[in-house]
From Swiss-Prot:
GO CC terms: small ribosomal subunit
Source organism of this protein record: Rhodospirillum rubrum (strain ATCC 11170 / ATH 1.1.1 / DSM 467 / LMG 4362 / NCIMB 8255 / S1)
Family membership noted in the UniProt record: Belongs to the bacterial ribosomal protein bS20 family.
Protein name according to UniProt: Small ribosomal subunit protein bS20
Protein role: Binds directly to 16S ribosomal RNA.
Residues in coiled coil: none
SUPFAM superfamilies, per the entry: Ribosomal protein S20
A Gene Ontology BP annotation from the UniProt entry: translation
Assigned keywords, A-Z: Ribonucleoprotein, Ribosomal protein, RNA-binding, rRNA-binding
PANTHER family named in the record: 30S RIBOSOMAL PROTEIN S20, SMALL RIBOSOMAL SUBUNIT PROTEIN BS20C
GO molecular function, a single term: structural constituent of ribosome
A Pfam cross-reference name: Ribosomal_S20p
Gene symbol of the encoding locus: rpsT
Record keyword Transmembrane present: no
Length: 88
């Protein structure tokens, strides 16, 4: 347990930030899963629509610091490639 007042404050702050970050990551995963479900069903229009909603959420994760830029780019790129492959 922390002894300094500032360290005790940081423990509380870290816990609350961790909770918020966990919620953000869960939100991103939910949107990505919706895209993956649409891809699995083979509905290209639904997949594109879900992708257009999910893409800004993934980028917001980068802005908020819960995802690395390369991770977000990789997710977006792979989802986009899978959507394009539906029609081919």
């Amino acid at each position: 347990m922390a002894n300094h007042k500032s360290a005790k404050k940081r423990i509380l702050r870290n816990a609350s930030r961790s909770e918020i970050n966990h919620a953000r990551i869960g939100r991103i995963r939910t949107f990505v899963k919706k895209v993956e479900a649409a891809i699995a069903s083979g509905d290209k229009d639904a997949a594109k629509a879900a992708f257009q909603i999910a893409m800004p959420e993934v980028q917001r994760g980068v802005t908020k610091g819960v995802l690395h830029q390369n991770t977000a780019s990789r997710k977006i790129s792979r989802l986009s490639a899978r959507i394009k492959a539906i029609g081919a």
